[in-house]
């Protein structure tokens, strides 16, 4: 039997990258999915966000596996819209069991005292408040099912250690850990488990862009992907520059499956050993 057969999962940031990979992995294991993403570039972060066409492609990939997919165009910062759309989707599919609060952004580097106020607020609003909004919207549906459930919050290696020039990102990702631990305590009596994932660099458009290259090679005027690959490898204990989205999806599948039935409140690195350094 598939590991999440007959369950329904909510995934934010589902247009591409880790979110699409999570959707496909869970569909392969028997879940129907609710896919959330922003359909256009609502923020200026130095690289393009996922598109409506990419979100539709994720849905097609899921449906090609014989599972149902509902697409939601919503910004995780907009609680009212997110609530209405998720309520509608859960009503259609009849239940909610799994949540992957995966939506997030990266940023160009700044020294902490040079971060523009709007850049700081945007980071916290999406990478922390957006995760809380996702949980806030989803938890009542999981509790209504009285079957337990699993919530996985996407943090980062930067949620477990500090990094220079991205304090706004690191602060948001550390905040996700605190939120995860509080939710785990609150929801444990209902057999709802809450954990967080902490990847190192993941090979997606979120890192394959000029802003990230500059973070890892600050002494180079115009760093390239090859420069980034060399610099990124030095940050990991294992001799690799990054992991792939499926590596994170494999960890997520474990956490939401019965294999992890007694794991809650855990911060799980998928980091090639970067938090050891």
Swiss-Prot record:
Record keywords, A-Z: NAD, Oxidoreductase
PROSITE patterns linked: ADH_SHORT (PS00061)
Listed pathway(s): Terpene metabolism; limonene degradation
EC number: 1.1.1.n4
Thermal response of activity: Optimum temperature is 50 degrees Celsius.
Pfam name, any one: adh_short
Catalytic activity: (1S,5R)-carveol + NAD(+) = (R)-carvone + NADH + H(+); (1S,5S)-carveol + NAD(+) = (S)-carvone + NADH + H(+)
Domain of life: Bacteria
Record note on quaternary structure: Homotetramer.
A biological-process GO annotation: limonene catabolic process
Name of the protein: (-)-trans-carveol dehydrogenase
Functional note: Catalyzes the oxidation of carveol to carvone, with a strong stereoselectivity since it efficiently converts only the (6S)-stereoisomers, of which (-)-(4R,6S)-trans-carveol is the better substrate. Displays a broad substrate specificity with a preference for substituted cyclohexanols, and does not catalyze the oxidation of primary or short chain aliphatic secondary alcohols. Is also able, albeit more slowly, to oxidize limonene-1,2-diol into 1-hydroxy-2-oxolimonene.
Further remark: In vitro, is only active in the presence of the artificial electron acceptor dichlorophenolindophenol (DCPIP). The physiological electron acceptor that is used to regenerate NAD(+) in vivo is unknown.
Record carries keyword Chloroplast: no
Gene Ontology molecular function: oxidoreductase activity
Binding site residues for substrate: 156
InterPro entries reported in the protein's UniProt record: NAD(P)-bd_dom_sf, Sc_DH/Rdtase_CS, SDR_fam, SDR_subfam_1
Catalytic residue list: 169 (proton acceptor)
Residues engaged in binding NAD(+): 10-32
Chain segments annotated as coiled-coil in the UniProt record: none
Regulation: Competitively inhibited by the product (S)- or (R)-carvone.
Organism, as annotated: Rhodococcus erythropolis
Activity-pH behavior: Optimum pH is 5.5. Shows 25% of the optimal activity at pH 4.6 and 7.0.
Similarity annotation: Belongs to the short-chain dehydrogenases/reductases (SDR) family.
Keyword check for Acetylation: no
Annotated gene: limC
Conditions for induction: By limonene and carveol.
